[in-house]
């Protein structure tokens, strides 16, 4: 992280130990020279200003360090007795609790500093220990700098004036230190700042000396090279205290938030430093940096000297324990400090004996700090905070000199950590938790004071992240260390690794070996040095160190106890912290984490930060008092197990001292000079006490460390085992996934093989199909070549499409049928399986997230789930969908890829799901293909039907392949949407492009020919698609059974109805069967419908339902049936069925198609034979509807009704239903071309109406609502809207009206909710989908039953009206054809591009919408009522409740869109008005609020603005893909597009919008994206309170927060302002820019565009100016 220069007052343990009265010199702070040498100036330093031993130097570097009035006098002045110092420390803690907490990071150097902190606090506050920025360091930087003042002020007990005086003293000291450090800079560079939290540091933690807090907050977290030098300063300032400072920086980075050392040991000087430090640390950051550099040199030199002395002396004195504790403390802290501990470790613990290790350590710590700057900061500071705290008690006893030296001598740290790691781990864990919590609480509290909470939260999140990462890295490292421990035990590891693992494990091994060897050496040296030095410097410092070490050891024990209590791993974490600090020093990130004793201990600090934040952050003085008491208690507890009596006595003494200090802190604020003297005395006493205590503690700590090490080793082993287990699990999971994938692939391959064999057999039976298969193979090869030449053939694709379309148009129906069958079989091979669960494929496909990611995924998911594009979009795995979107124009070339890839994806699923379905399908296909063949032969055009059966067999093969090759079907759906959807898509394409309409004609002729077989294959494809799509819904088996039953029934019905209505094999035509069904439907239409044109017209009629075509051609079958059956009875049932089927085609294409076919047959039978309608429709409908309701209903309600019907309710559905129905009647009356034209025109009209919706914000209802239908299936399924839609389609006008009016409000609400939920409720989608699906299954079952009853009623009505309306429809369609054909031409141009991507969505959507429109129109109007009836049906539907708003939209679209739709006939108006009146009455009845209800009973959704649901027509989702809608959504920039193209686009969009007022606002913003953004914002805002989800009455917090966020965003946020705040622009500047823009547009744009440009340019320029 970036180096944060923190003003950290680092107290030298040396100075503290030397004299409490005099402010310790930098060198004394850097490390205690031996007691006398602490007072004795280093001769080398006096001569050269440089000392090789740096911080380890036993002698005072600089005659003036003490002489600057603070060092010796401040330290050793008996006026500042240790007790007074402690009391002052406590008082300062209490007074400066916030300050020390702020400065704990800064001043974690030590309470020595606290004692001398008044003088040195300034220095150390000025000492900018530049820590690498970690989230914590950054947090603490801000915190301790700003909150230092705040904390200084925060600890108001600490007088600000006193703080100023202390600050001034500190400044003086810092000046001296800066001079000294400048002199010793070179040596400091050599000397590693061993930020081992020495007992002083622990004391400083306990008595949060400002220096400790500063250092704890800033130095380590900021630890960078300067942090190391600052750490060196800390070490210098308190060589022992600097380890403590390091630990206290770690723990006080934690504890600065904890605000107060937990140990009662008095850190009085710290408050002074804190008080002054906060203010002057900033001033002296530069000085402190310089001082840090010099101190780093001195610290290194002194560290060497001290290490030598410590090695010599502490070897005799409590060697292992102290050193372990300091070393581990330092290890935690120093490795936290960065490389210091690591470098110390990297030489190996043996380096401890050598002065060079300190240099290396010093070098490494800076390096590591910089290397792992943020880890070092945040980690090392937490580690320092955490790991040192535990180790501080021994280190405290050693004295901060020892700790600094130990931190300098990393091996000592290793030994001490090994010894103290048990204790240290506990204490560190507890301390570091507390200190980290304290530091974080204080630093965070200070941050909170200084930082916005967002910054704090970010930092905390960063810290938490880092902690987690560090925990993870620590766990890894710990496991490594456990492994390396064996290696490191031998010290055979990489120096760093050996250090880190030595730190982690060598502390154990070294405890075993080095602990006795090196700890005896180094701890004895450092302790003898530290204690002798402390004694030489001053027994006060030693006493202080001891008392602080006691308090810190208490803190450590307390923290160890806490950390044990909190985190049993904390000792391990502590060891990790030590190891990890080393390891983390090795890996800078691991530095952070391991320094954070462990990731878990770090997080546990976060887990329990409130304990510490609570204590320190909230009440630093309280935390100091009570936190220290807690620490004492915990330490006593922790230490009592090790040396309960000693620690209890010491802790009691420390508690008494700290309590005295805490009591005196309030008193001593004005007597800080006396306190300093008393502190010096107390420090000397405490030093002596602490030396003894440290020895005892060191022994106990060594025991504890060993225990902790063992525990840590066990934990690490367990973690390793767990990691290995997790890895094994992951491997097993991966293997299982791979196996499953392989199985899926094998299944797909087997299915492909089986399908190929079937196709071969069928090809043997049918040479035509063989030729078609050859053509398919050729086209596959071509498509493969196209895939190879994909980019080259991108250009040729459109040409090929056009050629194919033209060829298909030009070719004879059979030629077209052969080619299309082959192509469609390609498509079928790919498409039924795409049908299968494109949803699942998406979900399972790796590209699903990428492809469907974001809005595309949501929208496409919506569209795919809503728009029944089972073959295409759903089955298209996201990759395929991506491919489809990318290359739908390229799809012909990419078809083989998609087919193969989607076959891979889908066939995997299909092999699983469809393996049985394929068998069933094969059986049903064979049976029904034969049935269909016989029926088709029996039916009209036996030759055609044979061709159809042949093609149906081919298509059955293809569909088996398609179902097995869902992606092939997708690709072929894409190609087949180019080819097969030249059947389906070209039908839908007719909606967009007449060429495809022609193709659709020929395609549907093909379909008619191949109806029977394709019916079977379609049904089976629908079965598979049900299984794949339906499988999402549980009743897959039921669906299969029902589908098979329906297949049988369809075959029977086909036989009977083919006998009756020869063309009525429609129910079985699901996708491809629609060809045959269309043929039969054409014939039936020809035979049945008097006005029906010859079968070519009928064949054209099935194409008119592109929705059905895409669906499974179910709607084309339904349309064929509707057309054949005069589109009244049949279209009602067929539309109901196809509505069910169309949505269900996604889910239940088979049932939907079968049911739609059955109902189509029923309706046809009804039309042809009303008694049959009553009998067969009643029988078939009721059982089939019930079945459908159960299986289809569930799936439908899941996807089909909710998505399909909700889609279909959109304008496209109503328009298309009207259009398709009228198209059917027109086709019946006028002709297939007219129908196709009408379809294209109607679809264009639908687009227009939907674009009007889009402009109105209805794109939400049609587009967004349709998205939300798919997305928030729940809202519609769960919402009565889906039920309404079901009811409106199936229910009688009354039941529909009532249900729908109820549902309308819910539907409107939910549509708006879903619009909003499109964004807001996408999270709800999954849950909502499943929940409403279940609800809607039942509802849809019931409603479909009601529908069929109502359908029968409506069919009678509609039959009467169909005759009159069909004539009007012919007129209307002719008009609309003429009107829309021009639009379709432009739409074709725009959509030709969008077609590839959107057509397929549109085709499926249009199929959905057409099928749903047909269903609605047939159900609602019960008759295909011309284009007027489309509006009428839209209105009737909306008036009937489902589509009231939709129909209103259709009305507005039809009427307000420049009368794109012809006026509604009187019959239609009567029905619409009747339905309107009924539904409005129902709505009013529902709207009428009952008498005051219980709040729970109130439907508060009534309070929501009941936006009249603009008729959501079935193809609402298709609106998204109309060129206008797409351009609206995508937006078009006049500048980029040019005024000419812009004018065209605007024209197209305006045409499609059908609302001139909306067209004016089409491109309000010149930046296209802004238009859609503004639209979406409007929709979002409008629907905020509407789309509340399935449980509208219960507003969940998530929804509430989402609403609030959106409200803030939309109304107050910058989003709207960025787009709309044109007033921000200077008017003159705007005028000039407008002039320039006009000139540019005049140059670039034709004259006619200039006006638009001027109009648009003014608004858009304003916005551009705002935006740009």
Swiss-Prot record:
Component of the WMM complex, a N6-methyltransferase complex composed of a catalytic subcomplex, named MAC, and of an associated subcomplex, named MACOM. The MAC subcomplex is composed of METTL3 and METTL14. The MACOM subcomplex is composed of WTAP, ZC3H13, CBLL1/HAKAI, VIRMA, and, in some cases of RBM15 (RBM15 or RBM15B). Also a component of a MACOM-like complex, named WTAP complex, composed of WTAP, ZC3H13, CBLL1/HAKAI, VIRMA, RBM15, BCLAF1 and THRAP3. The modification Phosphoserine is found at residues 64, 77, 198, 207, 209, 211, 238, 242, 265, 316, 318, 325, 328, 370, 372, 381, 643, 831, 833, 837, 845, 848, 853, 873, 875, 877, 943, 986, 993, 1010, 1014, 1017, 1191, 1194, 1208, 1210, 1230, 1364, 1366, 1382, 1386, 1406, 1409, 1438, 1465. Residues 10-23, 239-254 have a biased composition (Polar residues). There is a cross-link at residues 179, 194 (Glycyl lysine isopeptide (Lys-Gly) (interchain with G-Cter in SUMO2)). Belongs to the ZC3H13 family. GO terms for molecular function: RNA binding; zinc ion binding. The keyword Coiled coil applies. Residues 76-136, 283-315, 394-434, 442-575, 594-640, 649-821, 881-957, 970-981, 1073-1083, 1163-1188, 1213-1223, 1231-1286, 1294-1379, 1386-1421, 1429-1438 have a biased composition (Basic and acidic residues). GO terms for biological process: mRNA processing; regulation of stem cell population maintenance; RNA splicing. This is Zinc finger CCCH domain-containing protein 13. The modification Phosphothreonine is found at residues 237, 263, 354, 364, 882, 1033, 1170. SMART domains: ZnF_C3H1. GO terms for cellular component: nuclear speck; nucleoplasm; nucleus; RNA N6-methyladenosine methyltransferase complex. Residues 214-224, 958-969, 996-1010 have a biased composition (Basic residues). Residues 1-38, 56-157, 190-1112, 1125-1466 are annotated as: Disordered. Keywords: Coiled coil, Developmental protein, Isopeptide bond, Metal-binding, mRNA processing, mRNA splicing, Nucleus, Phosphoprotein, Repeat, Ubl conjugation, Zinc, Zinc-finger.
